[in-house]
C-alpha cells in the first residue's frame, strides 16, 4: 500500500474553517465514525476526550479535490489527485483538545489491514525492479474567490 498522509492544523484549521471534498459517498470506517457521519465536513472547537473519526470517500470523477479554507485568515489549501492512482481516500478527523488536526490521505488501498486488502484483491504489487509514478498536487489559496473557483 502507498499513502500520502497530510495533516492540516492551526492556524488553517479552526472551528471556522470550511471543508470540501468532491466525493459522492462518505463511509465511516468504524462505530466511532458512524457517530460523526452527519458532521463529517464540519469543524468544531477543540473538544476534550474527542475520539478520532475516519471516513472513506468515494468518487465518480477521475480528479479528487480535498479543500480547507479559513475565512478568518483568508488562506486555504487544495489537495488534488487522480482517483485511478489513488482509488481510496481517507479523512482522519481529530478534534481533540490537544490533538486538533484533519488528516487527508490519498491511498492505494483501504487501511483495514493487509489480510483484508489481499482478500478484496485491492493490493498494489510491484515486481522486482518495477516502478510506478504517483502524483499529488497541492495548491494554496490567498482569498475566497480562489477557493470558490477551485471547487
Set out the residue ranges of the language-model regions.
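Active-site/ligand-binding surface loops and adjacent short beta/alpha elements
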Residues: 7-81
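Active-site pocket scaffolds in enzymes
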Residues: 73-151
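Sparse, context-dependent recognition of short Cys/His-centered cofactor- or disulfide-binding micro-motifs
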Residues: 4, 51-53, 64, 87-89, ...
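Short intrinsically disordered coil segments
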Residues: 4, 21-24, 34, 119-122, ...
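Active-site-proximal structural scaffolding
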Residues: 1-2, 61, 97
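HotDog/MaoC-like acyl-thioester-processing domains
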Residues: 1-16, 146-151
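Hydrophobic residues positioned within well-ordered beta-strands of beta-sheet architectures
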Residues: 2-4, 64-66, 102, 134-136
Amino acid at each position: 500500500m502507498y499513502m500520502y498522509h497530510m495533516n492540516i492544523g492551526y492556524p488553517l484549521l479552526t472551528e471556522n474553517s470550511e471543508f470540501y471534498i468532491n466525493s459522492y459517498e462518505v463511509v465511516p470506517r468504524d462505530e466511532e465514525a458512524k457517530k460523526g457521519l452527519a458532521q463529517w465536513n464540519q469543524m468544531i472547537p477543540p473538544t476534550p476526550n474527542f475520539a478520532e473519526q475516519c471516513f472513506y470517500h468515494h468518487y465518480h470523477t477521475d480528479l479528487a479535490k480535498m479543500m480547507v479554507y479559513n475565512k478568518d485568515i483568508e488562506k486555504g489549501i487544495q489537495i488534488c489527485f487522480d482517483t485511478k492512482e489513488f482509488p481510496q481516500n481517507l479523512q482522519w478527523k481529530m478534534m481533540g483538545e490537544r490533538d486538533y488536526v484533519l488528516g487527508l490521505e490519498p491511498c492505494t488501498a483501504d487501511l483495514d489491514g493487509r489480510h483484508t486488502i489481499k482478500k478484496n484483491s485491492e493490493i498494489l504489487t510491484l515486481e522486482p525492479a518495477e516502478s510506478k509514478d504517483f502524483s499529488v498536487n497541492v495548491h494554496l489559496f490567498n482569498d475566497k474567490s480562489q477557493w470558490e473557483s477551485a471547487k
